[in-house]
């Protein structure tokens, strides 16, 4: 009996179907050749392994090659509790002055962090225009405000980075742990605008104010996450690269706040097709700059931070 051929991941099969459907509609609905090219390129990337495999494991069909430490791509999307804390300036807290806080978070965690969704663009009128444009890269503007974290590395390293990023980011989206916010909330401060935790309150606490060891839910906090990250790194043969696994082919959604990758130069603010006043970067959002971090492997160029 002949061996059954290995079945392609569902994600690849869906891509092939989308490609065939788009090809059929090309003459009927004027589907752009660029759309077909994008789908075709994604299929080739996954089948040939020319970049880290990015097959989403949404239905259990994806597997990690742990033995060979083949790179994987992890994506986590975290909602922001804007309904529970309408007066809390999450964007200002996460970005910091000139994007310095988000830049430091990325340097420390070796991940790609973006703020996406409704309310993620500085120019609200431009955001509304892009939301109604029907362009697929701005589809995220119809979703709730959220953070997207991407980690590309060997399996153990990728998960360790993701855990570290989630632990660090949680401190910035937990108003109860911000003494400035709690103090002002206790005095019944009204809604105001500013860069601090409370809209109109003092500025962000900065790195020195981000205390460690205040873990919640029984977890021992960032220190333990950092230890796990180091242990995962010591037990893998992976050679760290200055781009943290991202290459020049990386692209994503437009709008929001993100850091475009610029080859070996690291994460830099790139001029060009920005969306809205003061926006920079090829993906149409207000981009921050990616530079060297505290780890020996983080040797990217400094770039420049785009002001919020």
UniProtKB/Swiss-Prot annotation:
Post-translational modification: The arginines in the Gly-rich domain might be methylated.
SUPFAM superfamilies reported for this sequence: Eukaryotic type KH-domain (KH-domain type I) (SSF54791)
Pfam family, one: KH-I_KHDC4-BBP
GO cellular component, one term: ribonucleoprotein complex
Name this protein carries in UniProt: Glycine-rich protein GRP33
SMART domains, per database record: KH
CDD domains linked: KH-I_KHDRBS
InterPro entries in UniProt: BBP-like, KH_1_KHDC4/BBP-like, KH_dom, KH_dom_type_1_sf
Signal peptide range in chain numbering: none
Gene Ontology MF term list: mRNA binding
Residue span of region Disordered: 203-222, 270-308
Disulfide bonds: none
Entry keywords, A to Z: Methylation, Ribonucleoprotein, RNA-binding
Organism: Artemia salina
Biological-process GO terms, alphabetical: regulation of alternative mRNA splicing, via spliceosome
Biased composition (Gly residues): 203-220, 273-294
Domain KH: 83-118
Keyword match Ribosomal protein: no
């Amino acid at each position: 009996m002949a061996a059954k051929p290995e079945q392609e991941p569902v994600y690849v099969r869906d891509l092939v179907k989308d490609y065939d459907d788009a090809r059929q509609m090309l003459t009927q609905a004027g589907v752009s050749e660029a759309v077909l090219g994008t789908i075709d390129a994604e299929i080739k990337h996954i089948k040939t392994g020319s970049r880290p495999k990015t097959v989403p494991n949404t239905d259990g069909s994806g597997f990690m090659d742990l033995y060979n430490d083949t790179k994987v791509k992890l994506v986590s999307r975290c909602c922001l509790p804007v309904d529970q804390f309408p007066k809390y300036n999450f964007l200002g807290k996460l970005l910091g002055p000139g994007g310095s806080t988000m830049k430091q978070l990325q340097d420390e965690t070796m991940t790609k962090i973006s703020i996406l969704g409704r309310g993620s663009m500085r120019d609200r009128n431009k955001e509304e225009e892009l939301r109604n444009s029907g362009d697929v890269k701005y589809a995220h503007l119809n979703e709730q405000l959220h953070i997207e974290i991407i980690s590309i590395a060997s399996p153990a390293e990728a998960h360790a980075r993701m855990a570290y990023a989630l632990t660090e980011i949680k401190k910035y989206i937990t108003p109860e742990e911000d003494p400035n916010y709690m103090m002002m909330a206790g005095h019944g401060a009204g809604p105001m605008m500013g860069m601090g935790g409370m809209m109109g309150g003092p500025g962000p606490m900065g790195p020195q104010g981000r205390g460690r060891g205040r873990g919640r839910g029984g977890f021992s906090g960032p220190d333990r996450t950092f230890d796990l990250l180091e242990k995962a790194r010591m037990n893998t043969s992976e050679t760290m690269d200055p781009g943290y696994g991202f290459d020049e082919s990386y692209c994503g959604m437009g709008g929001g706040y993100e850091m475009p990758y610029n080859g070996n130069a690291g994460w830099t603010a790139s001029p060009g097709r920005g969306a809205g006043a003061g926006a920079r970067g090829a993906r149409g959002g207000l981009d921050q700059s990616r530079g060297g971090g505290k780890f020996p492997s983080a040797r990217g160029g400094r770039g420049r931070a785009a002001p919020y």
